[in-house]
Amino acid sequence: MSNETRDLYNYQYPSSFSLHEMMNLPTSNPSSYGNLPSQNGFNPSTYSFTDCLQSSPAAYESLLQKTFGLSPSSSEVFNSSIDQEPNRDVTNDVINGGACNETETRVSPSNSSSSEADHPGEDSGKSRRKRELVGEEDQISKKVGKTKKTEVKKQREPRVSFMTKSEVDHLEDGYRWRKYGQKAVKNSPYPRSYYRCTTQKCNVKKRVERSFQDPTVVITTYEGQHNHPIPTNLRGSSAAAAMFSADLMTPRSFAHDMFRTAAYTNGGSVAAALDYGYGQSGYGSVNSNPSSHQVYHQGGEYELLREIFPSIFFKQEP
């Protein structure tokens, strides 16, 4: 039994061919596969598959020519492998180049930091220059701000003050006022009151205080000029109030002062503050008592006013 098994494994078929013989079979005459002569010293029985793989391109070409009747040129066989090598080199170059560029990009911050460390004086000088420029800009802006504030202060409206003997602090002048503040006066027991005109878009202000030297004297100071006519007619003289509309008044007019003199001379009740709202100036102290008024004027101007105003205003009391 053991002998039969051994013979089974060692049995060789007579009609079988080796791999080398099959590779060297000619294609032109299939009947001659079992009887292959050696050509040019090529013995297929001694040429193994390993030798075929390790053979040179010339031997591999001759083997193909003898076996299958093919004669490919060496350029056609190895063209693909040759063409692939430059592509591989280019790919490697691109990859290597990208890596180099990334390395250079990453290294650049360290290079800049090292350059900064090598030249600390230049950086300190630049930063110092920047601080100086910022300081100069701040100084210029401060100067411009101070100049603007000074200009705003210079645009303050002119002030005109009047002294009147009266027991009442707030004298009637034909305009409506609103009290918005009160302040103590230094070296005086009497406070100072602040008023504002109630007409819209009118910025006229006035302040009223009593003199600490003579408590019977009321000092009224007007700031600005009214831009509207008198809202109400004054007591007892509507014609006089109409004559002094805003379009006929001019600052510091001597005619206005002379009219005030005529009004008091005739005993009318036109208040002395009629002209205060327009910012006119008096040439002396005005007394609320018509019998004891005191106003100074020039002779030539007085004669001119007599021709302009009705004569009834210039009648002298006996």
Curated annotation (Swiss-Prot):
GO CC term (a single one): nucleus
The name this protein goes by in its record: WRKY transcription factor 28
List the InterPro entries: TF_WRKY_IIc, WRKY_dom, WRKY_dom_sf, WRKY_plant
Q: Tell me what organism the protein belongs to.
A: Arabidopsis thaliana (Mouse-ear cress)
Basic and acidic residues bias spans? 116-126, 148-158
Family from the record? Belongs to the WRKY group II-c family.
Q: Which GO terms describe its biological process?
A: positive regulation of leaf senescence; regulation of cell fate specification
| Annotated region described as Disordered, given as residue ranges | 74-158
Q: Which UniProt keywords apply?
A: DNA-binding, Nucleus, Transcription, Transcription regulation
What is the documented function of this protein? Transcription factor. Interacts specifically with the W box (5'-(T)TGAC[CT]-3'), a frequently occurring elicitor-responsive cis-acting element.
